[in-house]
Amino acid sequence: MNGFAVIPSVTTTTTSGEPIASDVARKQNLLELDREGLERFFEDVLGEKRYRAHQVMKWIHHRYVADFEQMTDVGKALRTRLQACAEVRVPRVVFDKHSADGTHKWLLAMGTDRKNAIETVYIPDKGRGTLCVSSQIGCGLNCTFCSTATQGFNRNLTTAEIIGQVWVAARHLGNVPHQQRRLTNVVMMGMGEPLMNFDNVVRAMSVMRDDLGYGLSNKRVTLSTSGLVPMIDRLSTESDVSLAVSLHAPNDKLREQLVPLNKKYPIVELMASCERYLSVNRKRDSVTFEYTLMKGVNDKQEHAHELAKLMRQFDCAMQVKGAAKVNLIPFNPFPGTCYERSTEVDIRAFQKILLDAQILAMVRRTRGDDIDAACGQLKGQVVDRTRRQAEFRRTIEDRVGRDVAA
């Protein structure tokens, strides 16, 4: 998992794990490596001691230096050798936008052709700053209420492209690990399904939590998944970050309409995998279940009662009150969607039913919607390999045509 290649180095893969062909011999991008991988690179390729790798890792992730010549406590001879066989290649910022509420969004170009781009969002709040990180260019799961799904899918992001989002944001914010923290939390909730890019995501999260990296505690790094049951089980043995599940419906019939993955991994299997995750990771005492509220779709009182029952069953299975936490998310509209946001009255009524059932339920405050940076609005720039963009455009055109005819 911590392997590296100096020449050539092709780390970009499709979902099936096949490399994308490249005729260009590349230097090793050090952002691609976690601590163990960097130590091996310094020992095996450069013939250097491990502490040299630690020096360079701190320059990269603590001081945000990408030029070896600026690493002043690294010997000149080593800097010259690093220039010859390695690089620190970070994503290029296409543009960045500021929201009136302080939210900040970056569009970052990915890959050497720069044809694809992803979005990364920073959300400041009292005493904390959360970075929402993408794991794929587009998404292959086709959830019907998500803007990213309409863009189709291109490929998985490399480890360097994932941790590079953190690097760009932290550098912009003037974040100083262990001292002046502007970036306190990372959520893998951006574009893509993180567990479909398992190895690269886990390696990137390792750097986020490493003291030589960004020094975040395990509980401050959250992975959100639509429910790939086998990969949740694998995650429980390889990482102990906080787990969030995109539930969005309290029963299989409705969830299959919203999250097609449910046809393969129904709710009973999904909940069982969450139970196993907490059983293996004793330091984690809860799973957050995300529930996007859409007007007339999943926001009725019967849905709330059904969800409360499902959450109580999870608490009972774990023998811990509060093992299930619910994050209610008002739907954030995007062009062409057929869904609407639930009314404030219905949102509060839904929450009250959960609270009365002694289920911890919070309503997520909408942030960054004026710059399309709110939950479910990220779309980036995707060279689609799935034809989904064209299908979505045809759907919109058909809908407009029917409206005109009426």
From Swiss-Prot:
Under Gene Ontology molecular function, one entry of this record is: metal ion binding
Tell me which EC number(s) this protein carries.
2.1.1.192
Q: Any idea which residues are catalytic in this one?
A: 119, 375
Q: Which PROSITE patterns match?
A: RADICAL_SAM
Reaction(s) catalysed by this chain, per the record, are:
adenosine(2503) in 23S rRNA + 2 reduced [2Fe-2S]-[ferredoxin] + 2 S-adenosyl-L-methionine = 2-methyladenosine(2503) in 23S rRNA + 5'-deoxyadenosine + L-methionine + 2 oxidized [2Fe-2S]-[ferredoxin] + S-adenosyl-L-homocysteine; adenosine(37) in tRNA + 2 reduced [2Fe-2S]-[ferredoxin] + 2 S-adenosyl-L-methionine = 2-methyladenosine(37) in tRNA + 5'-deoxyadenosine + L-methionine + 2 oxidized [2Fe-2S]-[ferredoxin] + S-adenosyl-L-homocysteine
Q: Enumerate the InterPro entries for this protein.
A: Aldolase_TIM, Methyltransferase_A, RlmN_N, RNA_MTrfase_RlmN, rRNA_lsu_MTrfase_RlmN/Cfr, rSAM
Q: Which cofactor does it need?
A: [4Fe-4S] cluster
The cellular location(s) given in this protein's UniProt record come to: Cytoplasm
Superkingdom of the source species: Bacteria
Annotated Gene3D superfamilies: 1.10.150.530, Aldolase class I (3.20.20.70)
Q: What is its main location?
A: cytoplasm
Kind of enzyme, top EC level? transferase
Per the annotation, how and in what number is the cofactor bound? Binds 1 [4Fe-4S] cluster. The cluster is coordinated with 3 cysteines and an exchangeable S-adenosyl-L-methionine.
Q: Which GO terms describe its cellular component?
A: cytoplasm
The Gene Ontology biological process terms listed for this entry are: rRNA base methylation; tRNA methylation
The chain positions of domain Radical SAM core read: 125-370
Record-listed [4Fe-4S] cluster binding positions? 139, 143, 146
UniProt keyword Nuclease, yes or no: no
In this chain, S-adenosyl-L-methionine is annotated as bound at: 192-193, 224, 246-248, 332
Q: Which HAMAP family match?
A: RNA_methyltr_RlmN
Its function, per the record, reads:
Specifically methylates position 2 of adenine 2503 in 23S rRNA and position 2 of adenine 37 in tRNAs. m2A2503 modification seems to play a crucial role in the proofreading step occurring at the peptidyl transferase center and thus would serve to optimize ribosomal fidelity.
Question: What's in the misc comment field?
Answer: Reaction proceeds by a ping-pong mechanism involving intermediate methylation of a conserved cysteine residue.
Spell out the family assignment given in the record's similarity comment.
Belongs to the radical SAM superfamily. RlmN family.
Its protein name is Dual-specificity RNA methyltransferase RlmN
Q: Whose protein is this, by species?
A: Xylella fastidiosa (strain Temecula1 / ATCC 700964)
